[in-house]
Amino acid sequence: ARADPVRVPGAVQKLKPFMEEQAHHFLDRRIGDGHMDLVLDYASPVPAILTMKLMGLPYDNWHLYANLFHSVMALPQDSPEYAAAIGQAPALMQGVLDFAASRKAQPTDDLTSFLLQFEFEGRRLTDAQLLGIIWNLVAGGVDTTTSQTALTLLHLGTHPDLRQQLIDNPDLYRSATDELLRYFSVNQTLSRTVTRDVVINGQPLWRNDRVVISWLAANHDENEFDRPEQVILDRAPNRHLAFGLGPHRCIGSHLARLMAEVMVKAVLGRIPDYQVDVDNVRQYLGNPSMTGLAQLPVTFTPAAKRS
């Protein structure tokens, strides 16, 4: 039951006020300036703080985790900056284990406490298993939604007709969120190991072969989607695979979908005339299986903070 805030749509909705509060808080910090970076100033901190809340980690540490994962995705793997970012990981991992030890002594209703009490086949998780799961949850929480939101805001910022369509038709936010999930497929590929000899569409695959699944290709399959290279905000049906499939489907899909929707809606509601500084947009360079933005600078008409 304690995993419900991640897994169950109804429970995820209870987190919506917190998401909205954080979205507007970070917009308020820059809204009077008339310019901001929608990645560094907005799309990175908001999901990171929500992730801290779910895991039970201190809110004030959001930037430590967000900066690490953002740097690992954004920087070339052969750069000294990438090496420096990776070098921060062991201390953060130890911090996660120390935090878990404190939760073991005093459990609460967060996901870390749930994992500490979780049993599989009568056994609790080892420290290594616990660290691996928490690390993956934090990584997914602080980066993938950031990437999806940033790419969405870039696309809407450079396609004013779509942006205006969404502003004029707020009932489209849910379908638009799914359509842009399909279109970008932030987690573009996943590798798997073949468990038995099989032939698929005439191609033999042998046991223990490694294969790459392309979610991006599946989400742009002309046999499944009409005009797949076009963003259609009210596309229906939309059986995209942006969150994967089967037992490995993203556990936080409902959370990520709502968070992306809330953050995009807040931007279009508060700074609807934002203009993208396209010459200074920076793509991810660190991981070929992921897509996202390192920087998304924009300008807009300065506005007042929310009262």
Predicted feature descriptions by range:
Residues A1-S307:
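Cytochrome P450
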